Amino acid sequence: MELELEPITLPGVEDKRPMVIAGPCSAETEEQVMSTAKQLADKGLKLFRAGIWKPRTKPGGFEGVGVDGLAWLKEVKKETGMYVSTEVATAKHVYECLKAGIDLLWVGARTTANPFAVQEIADALKGVDIPVPVSYTHLR
């Protein structure tokens, strides 16, 4: 099986390397997200990311702000003109992001370790034209 990779292309974003996608690992408050986005936009960055759902090894830990954070990303897009992105781990995450108009999704390293989760996400994205980078961390 040969893997076909396509470059990520977004209108108004130069195809140069490296492509910088920046923002908080975890979106914790609207103020944090907006402040970070405005600072990055002022530096000329075009791609903003924020973790909305945070998978945890230990149950009971902070699992992210969830769907509420998607409204913050919509506001980032509206106020700065940046493209917005977040990590997805389930089909429900995909559907919520698509409803919110998120521009780019990514599949994190933890999720890639579960082929059932990857297939669920792929099924949710059928017929959708949205960039979906896949993280991969090789652990020794």
Task: Give the predicted meaning of each segment.
Residues 30-39, 89-94:
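Short, acidic/polar
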Residues 19-33, 61, 85-87:
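Active-site mouth loops of central-metabolism enzymes
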Residues 49-67:
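Glycine-rich, proline-tolerant flexible connector loops at the mouths of alpha/beta enzymes
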